[in-house]
Amino acid sequence: MGAVSGELTAPSRANPIVFQESLLASSSEQSATLPRHVAIIMDGNGRWARRRLLPRIEGHRQGAKSVRRAIEFCGDTGIKILTLYAFSTENWQRPKSEVSGLMRLLSEFIDSELEELHENDVKLSTIGDLERIPAAMAAKIKAAKSRTADNKSLILNIALSYGGRQDIVRAVKGLATALKSGTVDEDSVTEELFGRYLYTAGLPDPDLLIRTGGELRISNFLLWQAAYTELYFTPVLWPDFSKEDFLRAIEEYRSRQRRFGMTSEQVETDEGVE
């Protein structure tokens, strides 16, 4: 299911005209095979900064520019949901100065981008334990979500203070409470019902998960939701991740056959029926 990026048919960075033509094709002629929901593990900010002898926070600052490019790419191609792993439950263990810097960057991002997101019909959403986020930052996030709540072109879903295991444990506790109170009957418990207790309730599972930075793991991200997600790993560090790199991931996704546990023959038969 996973693949390290290699020689794909996506255009070269050196040929922006070819890239633009491919981008237009991706949003029209091949829209049927476009992933609806893309999740990204944005890895490599620290290494990007270290290689340039810069403070780690400068890598995160440059990474924020890649976030903007990713949002623009989704808007250009028609991807409907973009989930970004911005801050994990484990990230609280990092030096306080780095955590504070990340929170400042998030605040700056909301200040600088919110109105443009709203004008482009982007809905801001979050998953994760926001109770651990500093109160002022949490209030700003809440206000930004309220401001964009009715937008429909793209859902920008930011994972903040999020961990896949914590998500599952929280859901188990919620379901156990419902069972104990009698609001849910044991016989009615299904995967679909369980999903309603996850942070991602109401959202489809990701079709494609991209990890930048070269590491080949998913780092406690969307563990339940990624059961049948296509995985794509690229050595490109997140601050360097371009629209061309994003397109390469999409082209790789389109080249795969999603079987969901079935055989290739079964999938081809189902596609023929459709």
Regions found by a protein language model. Name each.
Residues 2-274:
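Flexible, compositionally biased loop and terminal segments
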